[in-house]
Curated annotation (Swiss-Prot):
Keyword Isomerase: yes
Similarity annotation: Belongs to the GPI family.
Source species taxonomy: Bacteria, Pseudomonadati, Pseudomonadota, Gammaproteobacteria, Thiotrichales
PANTHER family for the chain: GLUCOSE-6-PHOSPHATE ISOMERASE
GO cellular component: cytosol
SUPFAM superfamilies documented for this protein: SIS domain (SSF53697)
GO function terms (MF aspect): carbohydrate derivative binding; glucose-6-phosphate isomerase activity; monosaccharide binding
The protein's annotated pathway: Carbohydrate biosynthesis; gluconeogenesis; Carbohydrate degradation; glycolysis; D-glyceraldehyde 3-phosphate and glycerone phosphate from D-glucose: step 2/4
Active site (record annotation): 346 (proton donor), 377, 505
Domain of life, per lineage: Bacteria
Single GO biological process annotation from the record: gluconeogenesis
Organism: Francisella philomiragia subsp. philomiragia (strain ATCC 25017 / CCUG 19701 / FSC 153 / O#319-036)
EC top class, as a word: isomerase
Function comment: Catalyzes the reversible isomerization of glucose-6-phosphate to fructose-6-phosphate.
Name of the protein: Glucose-6-phosphate isomerase
Length: 540
């Protein structure tokens, strides 16, 4: 990353005091905040000054970020290790202008697929789609993992006030049978439609759960023909889908140019549409599209995803931050951190650059967090008084869907108080005087004061939404998607492959064979620790 060059060492070592910056610049918030439609982005509590921001923006230009953005939107194959375009943005592009990739106008293909999904959703929600026994569908079970689960699950929960179809949507992901059983215990085989979401139709967890769900269905019906009434698929392997018993008319496309962690905008978002209706699903896409245009067309100093990516990369480089906390102050966003963990860590958890050379600077960080105010009674202690450097993103919503205004005001007050506490902290003198005023002796106050000091000067960003609607949620997700892209460009890494997950899958298959046959080559090749663990399992 250019900002990590030795030539910028002096600038990187420049210490910024937030208390000083706010005390000496009455216009700091005005200068270091941005508004886009109904999103307010306040980054004034970050450890930057005019000089640092200038250098960061220059770094973005020197990294050829503008051209890289254009390349992505144009469909150039920026996923170099897999020779693929990165075009999740095309799934929500409302311009309808042609986009030709490998000789085909994918815009036309995308729109056709959207209409197929819309038709299915309307057929099921209207009651025209019937189960094998003639009953209408009441429950949808999405079987998928990773991007086929985390995104849709997050959105369905976040948009719960917009559920309007009467359908109950469930999610099954883990290969642990308990994940599947939780759904099977509350659904009726005669009124359930399963979605099998797997590009290869061979993902171990998804396939095993789907086979077990199929067996459960057939235990009830005892007729193979029932599968076609109760299963649809999202896959590119038509032969495997047909072999499973799913009508190919009910198999929906997945394209190579859409990565799993960016796939909720595709047919993978079908479960979202089943919950909130297709019109609201389109509003989700429209919100993301608005940010796509903002990202592509706005100058860097006013570009929210660019600023987000620059700040995160700056902290990784200059402060060696190894994690970032994401704190949504809205219960509806309770799965947002889980979703972004995959989007961020699977994208930027890389240690070689685009040329395949090892990098000597830090790249991806651990993204973690939880909903407020729960975190205040769990891990915020570390944020305030721990000796690790952790930048924080607060996400808040100005208005809620309910009428409990006192709850909403308390929630927002806590959010803003946490960002203020991180910024200013409380000094020894402040604590000492408070203790004296509370009645403690000087000796007692001196003993206790060091334990109550909060250093402050810890950076945070606040993203404030007017409301949490399908449109604003789509925009929020897209902000973070593009932030991840910006970081990848600055670090000169490929944010769109994920080779690191393959080894564990391969070894898992070998160990599964070894567990059933200790004379197999797979067992003989195991290390002693793994053999010991297998023996312990077999002894039970």
């Amino acid at each position: 990353m250019l900002f990590c060059n030795d030539s910028n060492k002096e600038l990187r070592e420049q210490k910024v005091s937030l208390s000083h910056e706010f005390a000496t610049d009455n216009h700091r918030v005005e200068k270091l905040s941005l508004k886009f439609e109904n999103i307010y982005f306040d980054y004034s509590k970050n450890l930057v000054n005019d000089n640092i921001l200038k250098t960061l923006l220059e770094s973005a230009s020197k990294s050829n970020l503008k051209n890289k953005i254009q390349q992505m939107f144009a469909g150039e194959k920026i996923n170099s290790t897999e020779n693929r375009s990165v075009l999740h943005t095309a799934l929500r592009d409302l311009s309808n202008s042609p986009l030709v990739i490998d000789g085909q106008d994918i815009r036309k293909e995308v729109n056709e697929e959207k209409q197929r999904v819309k038709a299915l959703v309307e057929k099921v929600t209207s009651g025209d789609w019937k189960g094998f026994s003639g009953k209408r569908i009441t429950d949808i079970v999405n079987i998928g993992i990773g991007g086929s689960d985390l995104g849709p699950k997050m959105v369905v929960r976040a948009l719960q006030p917009y559920h309007c179809t009467g359908l109950k949507v469930h999610f099954v992901s883990n290969v642990d049978a308990d994940s599947l059983l939780q759904a099977l215990h509350v659904i009726d085989p005669e009124t359930t439609l399963f979605i099998v979401a797997s590009k290869s139709f061979s993902t171990e967890e998804t396939l095993l759960n789907s086979i077990s769900a199929r067996e459960w269905l057939l235990d009830h019906y005892e007729d193979e023909k029932a599968v076609a009434n109760h299963f649809v698929a999202i896959s590119s392997k038509l032969d495997k889908v047909e072999e499973f018993g799913i009508n190919l008319e009910h198999c929906y496309k997945m394209w190579d140019w859409v990565g799993g962690r960016y796939s909720l905008w595709s047919s993978i978002g079908m479960s979202i549409a089943f919950a909130v209706g297709y019109d609201n699903f389109e509003k989700l896409l429209a919100g993301a599209y608005s940010i796509d245009k903002h990202f592509k067309e706005t100058e860097f100093d006013k570009n929210i995803p660019v600023i987000m990516g620059l700040l995160a990369s700056y902290y990784s480089c200059a402060y060696q931050s190894q994690s970032q906390a994401l704190l949504p102050y809205d219960e509806r966003l309770c799965y947002f951190v889980d979703y972004l963990q995959q989007a961020d860590m699977e994208s930027n958890g890389k240690s070689v650059n685009l040329a395949g050379e090892g990098v000597d600077y830090q790249t991806g960080v651990v993204l973690w967090g939880g909903v407020g105010t729960n975190g205040q009674h769990a891990f915020h202690q570390l944020l305030h008084q721990g000796n690790v450097f952790i930048p924080v993103d607060f996400i808040a919503v100005a208005t809620s869907h309910h009428n409990y205004d006192n709850h909403q005001q308390a929630l927002l007050a806590n959010c803003f108080a946490q960002s203020q506490a991180l910024m200013f902290g409380q000094s020894y003198d402040m604590v000492y005087n408070e203790l004296l005023n509370s009645g403690l002796s000087e000796v007692q106050a001196k003993q206790l004061a060091p334990h109550k000091v909060i250093p402050g000067n810890r950076p945070s960003t606040t993203i404030l939404l007017d409301e949490l609607s399908p449109y604003t949620l789509g925009a929020l997700i897209a902000l973070y998607e593009h932030k991840i892209f910006v970081q990848g460009v600055l670090w000169d890494i490929n944010s769109y492959d994920q080779w690191g997950v393959e080894l564990g899958k391969k070894l898992g298959k070998n160990i599964l064979k070894a567990m059933s046959d200790d004379s197999s080559a797979e067992y003989q090749n195991l290390d002693e620790s793994t053999k010991w663990l297998i023996a312990k399992v077999k002894s039970k």
